[in-house]
């Protein structure tokens, strides 16, 4: 906020708005050129979520035509009475998290990139649930699945051209194992906590090299697990060790 105020004070609103529009147009043009370097076609991927009651499918087809990329979730299972569902805009965000590092690593990350993408997400499904569908754990549920599918179809598309084949990657951090604990501590007080150890993440293998054991996730290449001392200070837990398994 203070930095924006200082920019307005130095350059004025008209100049900042003009520069902002220019940056959006620049990003749009650059991603258009990048998409046109890639072959037209349709790439598909699907994942299943194992929940009480069965396996539930999320289906994605990505169709690239000239400089437009359409994501189509037709075939995805209906929403559930469980909190893993996504609203439309959560799905949109999960799709774009891999788009920026995989397609736009050298392009300013702003709204201009999104202008060439289309989303088909049938209402009432896991990726576009109707209110009042529960969505409290969407981030570790369908958001993660959509993120994975986006990585898969983009990597298949990149793998279809010699120029960008080496940028294709397997899924990073394929699932969030969200472990929730509650009970009584040594003083008889109720506690509840969420363990984020699985958030350490892992890097998927590339076309020419192995993956990495601990590497965060593709839109955020940093491990985000809470440190052991913090968990021990606030919960009746003691860590004996932390190590990859």
Can you describe what each PLM-predicted range is?
Residues 1-245:
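Glycine/proline-enriched, intrinsically flexible loops and inter-domain linkers
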């Amino acid at each position: 906020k203070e930095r924006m105020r200082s920019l307005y004070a130095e350059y004025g609103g008209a100049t900042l708005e003009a520069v902002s529009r220019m940056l959006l147009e620049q990003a749009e043009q650059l991603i258009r050129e990048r998409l046109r370097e890639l072959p037209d076609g349709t790439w598909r991927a699907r994942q299943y979520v194992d929940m009480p009651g069965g396996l539930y499918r999320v289906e994605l087809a990505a169709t690239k035509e000239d400089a437009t990329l359409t994501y189509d979730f037709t075939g995805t299972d209906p929403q559930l009475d469980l909190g893993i569902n996504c609203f439309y805009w959560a799905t949109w965000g999960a799709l774009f998290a891999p788009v920026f590092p995989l397609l736009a690593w050298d392009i300013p990350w702003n709204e201009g990139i999104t202008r060439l993408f289309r989303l088909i997400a049938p209402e009432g499904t896991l990726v576009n649930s109707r209110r009042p569908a529960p969505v409290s754990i969407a981030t570790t549920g369908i958001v993660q699945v959509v993120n994975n599918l986006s990585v898969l179809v983009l990597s298949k598309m990149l793998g279809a051209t010699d120029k960008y084949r080496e940028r294709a990657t397997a899924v990073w951090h394929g699932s969030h194992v969200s472990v929730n604990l509650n009970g009584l501590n040594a003083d008889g007080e109720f506690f509840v906590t969420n363990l984020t150890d699985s958030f350490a993440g892992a890097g998927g293998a590339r076309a020419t090299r192995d993956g990495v054991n601990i590497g965060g996730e593709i839109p955020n290449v940093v491990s985000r697990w809470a440190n052991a001392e913090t968990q021990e200070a606030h919960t009746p837990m003691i860590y004996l060790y932390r190590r990859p398994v």
